[in-house]
Amino acid sequence: IPQSETKIIERLGRYFATLKPGINVIIPFIDHAKDIVSMRNGRYVYTNSIDLREQVYDFDRQNVITKDNIQMQINALLYFQIVDPFKSVYEINNLPNAIEKLTQTTLRNIIGEMELDQTLTSRDTINTKLRAVLDDATNKWGIKVNRVELQDITPPESVLQAMEKQMQAERNKRATILTSEGEKEKQRLLSEGEKA
């Protein structure tokens, strides 16, 4: 077994051992490695070895609704590690699918408690909350969630246009204030020049 991998061995259909990296001996036809579902290159595959290194799941964009009923799309990355191979095989049937569904529903719940402005400015808060909830929920599956990163938060086009108009209005306001302050300073200097 290669370094950083392990295998679950069943003897006559029952759990027998968790094999560690290196040379291991099993009895042919009586012992066999348990097949598990894993995700490789964005696809579910069956394999009989469990990767103990940190893994990254890049989830597809999903639609979420904020507290103020604005629909937006969010893309998330999840960094996790299998710390208990036995639990990851026998406590959950399809680990990658379960992690994906749990991440999606938890993300929807967290975003549903926030308004649009909070969502756009609180990535770190969302990441921290999401990681804490996922780590707690996946602990019984033998998983340690190390990090969660929101890659992209995309509000609807109408909201983006409104934000652009608001930024343009803010820039125009600042330009008007600077122009009027310049005129005021010009008048003050002219009046001082006339007095002198």
What does each of the following model-derived ranges do?
Residues 186-189:
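Peptidyl-prolyl cis-trans isomerase
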